């Protein structure tokens, strides 16, 4: 099996201000993941508290990656918005760093949305 990121990889959380994003990001910090912040459109400039630490929130992935030099993103957004979040992350990593790892565990993403998102990522 290939190793896609190192143990100290800088990770962003898309949807960090939502219920699932907060829950999972908190557990990730507790278990030692190097969270560097999050992205939620319209909530840039805010911070979230995870494990008694403050993490910044940006409006866009491009802003977040530029500010943090993140290596990966994990996506915790509702199914109707997940494919768009994947494509935004792909664009941002491509334009800022040239590469990055995108993880999305959202259940119930419409099949056609995922087909479009996967094609978008692979055809870059």
Positions of PLM-derived features:
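Conserved hydrophobic helix-helix packing surfaces used for dimerization/oligomerization
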Residues: 11-13
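A short, basic/flexible loop-to-alpha-helix module at the beginning of a structural domain
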Residues: 1-8
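Rossmann-fold NAD(P)-binding glycine/threonine-rich loop
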Residues: 107-124
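Short acidic-hydrophobic, aromatic-tinged amphipathic segments that line or gate anion-handling sites
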Residues: 56-61
């Amino acid at each position: 099996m290939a190793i896609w990121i190192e143990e100290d990889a800088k990770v962003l959380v898309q949807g960090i201000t939502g219920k699932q994003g907060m829950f999972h990001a908190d557990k990730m910090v507790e278990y030692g993941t190097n969270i560097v912040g999050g992205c939620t459109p319209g909530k840039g400039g805010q911070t979230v508290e995870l494990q008694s630490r403050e993490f910044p929130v940006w409006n866009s992935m491009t802003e977040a990656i530029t500010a943090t030099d993140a290596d990966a993103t994990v996506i915790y957004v509702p199914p109707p918005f997940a494919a768009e979040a994947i494509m935004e992350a792909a664009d941002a990593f491509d334009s800022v760093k040239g590469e990055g790892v995108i993880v999305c565990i959202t259940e119930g993403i419409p099949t056609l949305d995922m087909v479009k998102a996967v094609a978008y990522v692979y055809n870059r």
